[in-house]
Structures are given as structure tokens and as C-alpha cells.
């Protein structure tokens, strides 16, 4: 259904100051900041629970130049953060948006802490592709560590209404071309069995809502939209697995493009290299493979028994290397670490994978090699070589940064191993915004009045590929900024 102009006599079912489409990081942050100004907020979530992908992601969050870094003696800068992101994004990122994140990230962290989010104290994660440790580790081990306290805080506010099973259908455009409201369906039920839920699902009752200050797009990406993602990249076949929740489709994005929102880099899709082929979707093993094996341990090709990449490189580099090894015969690489590494990470990262059986535990490296059918002799020599690199601090094979291993290698039994493979994780492209989170028109090249966006539905922040933990700060920060923009209208 195309966007339409309501007749002068048209009556809305309801009127709010702000309508937010989506209930993840960007949506929650926007709602909180706008509600603080006394604005009346309506948040629409099409699924039966709030949070979207934000609730199931890893949850750790990058923040350059933060107080913990300074206390730990870690030197960082806005310029270094932007350079790291641009390197992994192949130089097609929008520097002004990255600069905005760097300038406001400490405000964002303060906001979520004030809302009850808890981080591991006095600790910074050293994520792949980053030059220095700059990421806070969320205590909960997943994005639920934000969504639960933020949702609880919003539920206590009388001027915030959150509706689940509420499917956005379209924008209502005023006579001046501004977005002045939306149509949505109440009582909608998502149906994962349909080829395209956005096109085929007609459940629910249509309602119209006036948005006096504007509409915020916080609907996330389209990693589960089989048709749209393959349209952008024909190599991504329908059976390609994704880490995302089933509702991650392009419905809201395509409606925004339909009213003139400028598209940015829609064909760039990111794979997450930390996934397990035996699990559906995100699974429970990602944090273990990432923080135990790739941050501190090693990954080997089972046929050769040898390493084949810098395990601390950016996600695109690692995913490309993994796909090359996997080939056509499902030769899934094996990620390995030891007991000392396991004891150094968040206990929740290993508990569930062990219980689910995706991570295997062995008394000796020989047993690990036998179980995973790794070239044993070559593997044992490769472990010795890797341990030597850790000792000297120099990776002569792949130039991995080892100084933050702080002596942790693969030498203390028991040993742990897990298969790994990439899955579609993040759709890099989306609508164009400016640093004020205003959506830009591809017709006028100016902001579309009344339309804002933040999070994965936005393109350009990360370029061709994003660094881990930057999506969280991106969504929270631009959600916060959009909320501030709405709040300023209340004055």
C-alpha cells in the first residue's frame, strides 16, 4: 500500500508525539530520551516480545576514549576509532557518522548505566579489528542486559506505550510532504512459514496514528528476508543461515525507500565468523568462539592442522578465510583454547556451549585432534609454534596483535574445541541519515520532515563491514540523538 495524504476530514484512531517503529537498542534509547521531555510515545513492535536482534546479540559495546581505558592506561582516540572502522569498512563508511558516535559514546554509556545496565567493572575487551581494547563487556553476556532494564524503565513511564504484535504498514504523508503519521495492524501474528511475511501476512486490524513530532525508524536489518537479501547479493541463497531473529525483514526499509529515503550500500551483507554449523541461528556458542578462541586461542584447518588467518582481524577478513577453508565439502575449521583462557573469560560464555555439546572438552591435545579428525602431527607442531609466538609477542605467520594475550596460550589442560562457520549477521546498508539522525531524501537531498532513524536500518556508518561491538554503540547513540531531537521540539 503506497503512502497517502489523508483528507482534511480524516480522523486518526490515536495521536502521540512520537511513533517509534521497533523496540531494540535504537528504539528504546529514543523512547527514553524523548519521554524525559514529557512527550507521549508509542512504540510498535511486530513480534510478540520486545528487543528484536538487540536482545539476542553479544551485547558488548565499543566506546573510544572512555574512563576505564584511561584508568587502565590504554591510549585511544576518536581518530584511531574512525581509522579502525574505515579499514574494516573498506573506506566507504561515512566519517561524520563515525565521528558522532565517538563524540557521544560516553554520554550513551552513562545513559544505559543510569537505566540499570551493568558492565564487568575495570575491564575492556579487545575485539577483532580494533587497534586497542575499547569495548565494555555486558555482565549478562547478551544484549538482554540492556533490553531488560531499558524495557522495565520505559514500562514505568506513564507517557510511554509499548505494543507488541503491532505491524507497521505505511507512512501517512501530509500536504507539505512531511511524515505526519503511520498505519499499523494491531493483533498481527508473524508467520515464519510464509515466503514473504511482509507481503502475504494480512493478520491484524488496521489503525492510524498521528505523530505530532515525528516517526523514528528503529526496525533493524533484513538478514532474514530471503528475497530482499538475495536481490542485493545473488550469492546469498535461501538456505544460507542467519544469526538473526525471524522477524528481521525489509518491510519497514522498503516503505521508507518508497517515500524517498535515500538508499545507502544495500548490497553489503556481513557474515559473523564465530558461529557453529550445528546450531540454528545465533545459537549459544558465539561468545565462546569469539572471546576464548579467536581473541586468545587459535583456529586451524583440520586437513592441514595449521592456522590460516589472523584470528583477531576484522569480521570480513575472517569470514572470507573461513569460507575458503570450508570449501564445498564442509571442512569446518576448529577453534581451540585451553583451561587458562576459559578461566579468564566470562563464565557464561562456556557454560551453555558445554551443556549443549557444541564445545567439546579434552584432557589432551591429541584427544582433541582425534575427535575432530585434525591432522594430528601438524596440529601439535602448530600449537607449539603459536605458543612460541605468544611468548615472544610476535606472530610471524599472520601478524596478529598478541600483547593483550598477556601470556595466555594453548598449553594448560583441559583443552576445548569447537567447529566454526560464518552466518549472515548484519545488513550494512539502509537509509541515509545525518548526524542528527534525520533521514535524508534522495529527491531533495535534505531531511524528510518528521522522519528519523537509528541502528541497522541505517546505512553508511560501517561501510562494507563493521567491527564487533560498534553496532551496539551505533544503535544506542543514534537512538539517543533522535530522542534528543524530539525532546528539543517540546521546548
Predicted segment positions?
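Residue-level detector of alpha-helix initiation sites
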Residues: 24-25, 48-49, 383
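A glycine-rich dinucleotide-binding beta-alpha-beta segment and adjacent secondary-structure elements
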Residues: 378-465
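N-terminal Rossmann-like FAD-binding beta1-loop-alpha1 element of flavoenzymes
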Residues: 18-43
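Extreme N-terminal leader/targeting segments of oxidoreductases
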Residues: 1-18, 36, 459-461
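An anion/pyrophosphate-binding glycine-rich loop and adjacent beta-alpha core
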Residues: 253-255, 262-374
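Conserved N-terminal/central alpha/beta ligand/cofactor-binding core
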Residues: 2-10, 40, 46-170, 178, ...
Amino acid at each position: 500500500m503506497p503512502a497517502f495524504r489523508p483528507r482534511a476530514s480524516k480522523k486518526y484512531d490515536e495521536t502521540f508525539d512520537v511513533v517509534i517503529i521497533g523496540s531494540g537498542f535504537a528504539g528504546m534509547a529514543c523512547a527514553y530520551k524523548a519521554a524525559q521531555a514529557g512527550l507521549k510515545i508509542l512504540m510498535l513492535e511486530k513480534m510478540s516480545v520486545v528487543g528484536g536482534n538487540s536482545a539476542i546479540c553479544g551485547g558488548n559495546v565499543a566506546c573510544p576514549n572512555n574512563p576505564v581505558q584511561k584508568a587502565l592506561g590504554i591510549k585511544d582516540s576518536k581518530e584511531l576509532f574512525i581509522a579502525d572502522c574505515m579499514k574494516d569498512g573498506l573506506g566507504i563508511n561515512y566519517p561524520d557518522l563515525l565521528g558522532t558516535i565517538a563524540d557521544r559514546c560516553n554520554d550513551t554509556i552513562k545513559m544505559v548505566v543510569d537505566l540499570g545496565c551493568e558492565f564487568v567493572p575495570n575491564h575492556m575487551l579487545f575485539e577483532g579489528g580494533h587497534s586497542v581494547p575499547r569495548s565494555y563487556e555486558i555482565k549478562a553476556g547478551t544484549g538482554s542486559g540492556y533490553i531488560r532494564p531499558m524495557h522495565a524503565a520505559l514500562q514505568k513511564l506513564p507517557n510511554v506505550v509499548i505494543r507488541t504484535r503491532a505491524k507497521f504498514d505505511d507512512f501517512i504523508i501530509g500536504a507539505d510532504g512531511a511524515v505526519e503519521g503511520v498505519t499499523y495492524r494491531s493483533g498481527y501474528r508473524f508467520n515464519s512459514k510464509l515466503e514473504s511475511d511482509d507481503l502475504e501476512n494480512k493478520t491484524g486490524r488496521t489503525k492510524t496514528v498521528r505523530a505530532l513530532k515525528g516517526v523514528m525508524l528503529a526496525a533493524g536489518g533484513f538478514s532474514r528476508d530471503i528475497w530482499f537479501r538475495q536481490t542485493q547479493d545473488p550469492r546469498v541463497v535461501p538456505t544460507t543461515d542467519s544469526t538473526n531473529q525471524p522477524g528481521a525483514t525489509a518491510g519497514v526499509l522498503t516503505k521508507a525507500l518508497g517515500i524517498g529515503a535515500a538508499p545507502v550500500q544495500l548490497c553489503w551483507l556481513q557474515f559473523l565468523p564465530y558461529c557453529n554449523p550445528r546450531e540454528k541461528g545465533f545459537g549459544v556458542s558465539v561468545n565462546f568462539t569469539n572471546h576464548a578462541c579467536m581473541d586468545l586461542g587459535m583456529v586451524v584447518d583440520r586437513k592441514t592442522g595449521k592456522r590460516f588467518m589472523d584470528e583477531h582481524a576484522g569480521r570480513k577478513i575472517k569470514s572470507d578465510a573461513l569460507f575458503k577453508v570450508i570449501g564445498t565439502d564442509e571442512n569446518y575449521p576448529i577453534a581451540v583454547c585451553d583451561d587458562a583462557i576459559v578461566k579468564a573469560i566470562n563464565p557464561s560464555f562456556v557454560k551453555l556451549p558445554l551443556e549443549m555439546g557444541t564445545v567439546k572438552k579434552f584432557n589432551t591435545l591429541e584427544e582433541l585432534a582425534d575427535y575432530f579428525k585434525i591432522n594430528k602431527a601438524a596440529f601439535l607442531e602448530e600449537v607449539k609454534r603459536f605458543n612460541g609466538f605468544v611468548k615472544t609477542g610476535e606472530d610471524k605467520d599472520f601478524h596478529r596483535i598478541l600483547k593483550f594475550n598477556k601470556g595466555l596460550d594453548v598449553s594448560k589442560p583441559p583443552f576445548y574445541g569447537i567447529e566454526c562457520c560464518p552466518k549472515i549477521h548484519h545488513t550494512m546498508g539502509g537509509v541515509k541519515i545525518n548526524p542528527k539522525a534525520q533521514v535524508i531524501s534522495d529527491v531533495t537531498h535534505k531531511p524528510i520532515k518528521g522522519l528519523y532513524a537509528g541502528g541497522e536500518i541505517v546505512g553508511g556508518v560501517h561501510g562494507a563491514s563493521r567491527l564487533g561491538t560498534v553496532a551496539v554503540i551505533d544503535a544506542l547513540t543514534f537512538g539517543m540523538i533522535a530522542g534528543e531531537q524530539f525532546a528539543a521540539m517540546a521546548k
